[in-house]
Regions:
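Small beta-strand-rich domains/subdomains or short beta-sheet motifs embedded
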Residues: 71-73
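Acidic low-complexity segments
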Residues: 87-137, 141-142, 147, 151-153
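Conserved small/polar residues in nucleotide/adenosyl-binding loops
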Residues: 182-183
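Short histidine-centered loop motifs in beta-beta connectors
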Residues: 45-54, 58
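Conserved hydrophobic positions within beta-strands
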Residues: 78-80
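Gly-rich Lys/Arg/Thr-decorated short loops/hinges at beta-loop-alpha junctions or inter-strand turns
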Residues: 107, 136, 159-175
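Short hydrophobic beta/alpha edge segments that flank linear recognition/processing sites
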Residues: 56-69, 84-87, 94-101
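N-terminal, Lys/Arg-enriched amphipathic/low-complexity engagement segments
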Residues: 1-48
Length: 183
C-alpha cells in the first residue's frame, strides 16, 4: 500500500494568548491511575510492586530494563490494584501497574526535598535524573539520563532548554521556563 503525503502539513491557529498569562496551576489526579511499563522508548520497565502493595508518591514502581529505559515512578500514594497486561496507546498490549489513588499524596522518603545541585558532581546529578525516571515529553519519551551521559564531561557553561511548543493552546513549557528558571 502506498503511503500518501502532502506538502506543508497542517498549521492550526495557535491561540497561545488565551493561556500564556495565566498562573501555573497544579492539577492533582484522582481515582485510578494506569502506569504503562513501556511509556518510553527502549526496553520496558519491570514492575517491582504487586497487587495489594501500598505505594507512595515518588516511589519507583517499575525499574528500568536497561540503559535505554526509565524507571516508572508513582505520582500518587495509594494501593496497587493490579499488575496486568493492558492496551497501550499504539493499540498493542503491554504490562501496566494500576494504582488506586488514596487522595493523600504522601511522599516517599527524600522526594520533594530541595537539592542544591551546585555541590553535586555531574555523576551525582545524573544518578538523581536516572532514579527519578525523567524522560523527554516528545512522542518517544526518550530517557533524559541517556541524553546527559557523555564519555568525558567537560565544564558546562550553558544549558539550552528546548521549550518549543508546537501544539495549539499549549504554553506550560514557556511559562515554566519563564517563571521557574534559575539564572
Amino acid at each position: 500500500m502506498e503511503i500518501k503525503t502532502f506538502h506543508g502539513g497542517v498549521h492550526p491557529a495557535e491561540h497561545k494568548e488565551l493561556s500564556k498569562e495565566s498562573p501555573l496551576t497544579q492539577l492533582l489526579p484522582k481515582g485510578e491511575l494506569v502506569y504503562m511499563t513501556n511509556q518510553h522508548i527502549g526496553k520496558p520497565a519491570s514492575p517491582v510492586v504487586k497487587k495489594g502493595d501500598r505505594v507512595l508518591a515518588g516511589q519507583i514502581i517499575a525499574e528500568a530494563g536497561g540503559f535505554v529505559s526509565a524507571n516508572i515512578v508513582s505520582s500518587v500514594s495509594g494501593t496497587v490494584k493490579a499488575v496486568e497486561p493492558r492496551k497501550n496507546a499504539s493499540g498493542g498490549s503491554a504490562m501496566a501497574i494500576v494504582v488506586e489513588n488514596d487522595g493523600e499524596y504522601t511522599l516517599a522518603e527524600g522526594v520533594g526535598v530541595e537539592c542544591d545541585t551546585n555541590g553535586l558532581t555531574g555523576q551525582e546529578i545524573l544518578s538523581k535524573v536516572q532514579k527519578a525516571g525523567i524522560v523527554g515529553m516528545g512522542g518517544a519519551g526518550f530517557p533524559t539520563h541517556v541524553k546527559l551521559t557523555v564519555k568525558e564531561p567537560e565544564k558546562i557553561n550553558f544549558v539550552i532548554a528546548n521549550g518549543a511548543e508546537c501544539e495549539p493552546y499549549i504554553t506550560c513549557d514557556d511559562k515554566t521556563l519563564d517563571r521557574k528558571s534559575v539564572v
